[in-house]
Amino acid sequence: MGVTRNRFYIWFLFVVFFVTDLVFCRTLSGDPDPCDSTKQREFQKLRSDQVTVIINGYSEYRIPLLQTIVASYSSSSIVSSILVLWGNPSTPDQLLDQLYQNLIQYSPGSASISLIQQSSSSLNARFLPRSSVDTRAVLICDDDVEIDRRSLEFAFSVWKSNPDRLVGTFVRSHGFDLQGKEWIYTVHPDKYSIVLTKFMMMKQDYLFEYSCKGGAEMEEMRMIVDRMRNCEDILMNFVAADRLRAGPIMVGAERVRDWGDARNVEEQVVDERVRDAGLSSRRVEHRKRRGKCIREFHRVMGKMPLMYSYGKVVNSVGEQGLCRKAGKLVFCDRD
């Protein structure tokens, strides 16, 4: 009788802990009141040696890629935890259950992993403060960008030296069209003012600034993001630049692959639906919409806080001289 009771007790504990862990990590839609200032931890008390990775997920076609990306991040010792924010409300529960199990099973590192089913598809949700985040730095990234571990760790080292700046590997710029007399979204060859959320590292404070401060003005700009279904990254750059009066920092990466870039040709993409799932795959319309966002944010704020930065921080410059080897011009230090 005692043995049977003990077996039942062990089985009960297994079920409770297994199911509790699964439900918590898969159904949690965020803190009930993310803007409760009493729950905000003091910056100095947060961990400075690691970063929390927050990945935005939506497309079911990208789930295999998402699993690979999570596994890659989890393998780095600087990653404290990984939060996958799932914003597609139509995804079946069974598929999300399987996704969560795969994330746990195939991620080799010690980082804790949570799959958080969002209550809405609002892009603003990726910047909500979360009480579970215990690091000073957070990395906001997409589900279609792979970056190597050394580049991740280098970006973190750059951020630690510049904790008030936005740091990233993908950049764009604002500009003023003299002919049209309006602000536009563009790319400049020698300067930039916007870091994209493909890979954006920042201090946790900016989540609270974006989601909870700024009064009616900030609320109106978040509504613009919802209406356009775009531009949350541009608005975060507005927030950081307005507070800091400085532009972002671009860092170089040894190997980074953007599977959602529309310039991927079909032969290079395992499934073209992986490439086409993103909003930004429709390039011309995408750029026009983002230009409109910049103009709308400028209208609401009554000023243009975005500031230009120049150059890129790289891990090493290496050999710059070219030599002819095997009939090809290559850097001289290459075999």
Predicted regions and their residues:
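Active-site nucleotide-sugar/metal-binding loop of Leloir-type enzymes
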Residues: Q118, F127-A137
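Short, charged/polar "capping" segments at the starts of alpha-helices
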Residues: Y61-P64, P89-L99, F176-D177
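Short, acidic, metal-binding catalytic loop of nucleotide-sugar glycosyltransferases
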Residues: T68-S81
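Short beta-strand/loop segment that forms part of the nucleotide-sugar
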Residues: I55, I78-Q94, I116
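C-terminal catalytic/acceptor-binding lobe
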Residues: G2-S37, Q44-T52, Y61-A71, K213-D335
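Conserved donor nucleotide-binding strand/loop of the catalytic core
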Residues: Q105-S121
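Conserved catalytic core of nucleotide-sugar-dependent glycosyltransferases
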Residues: R130, C141, V145-V225, R229, ...
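Active-site acidic Asp-centered loop
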Residues: G87, D134, C141-D143
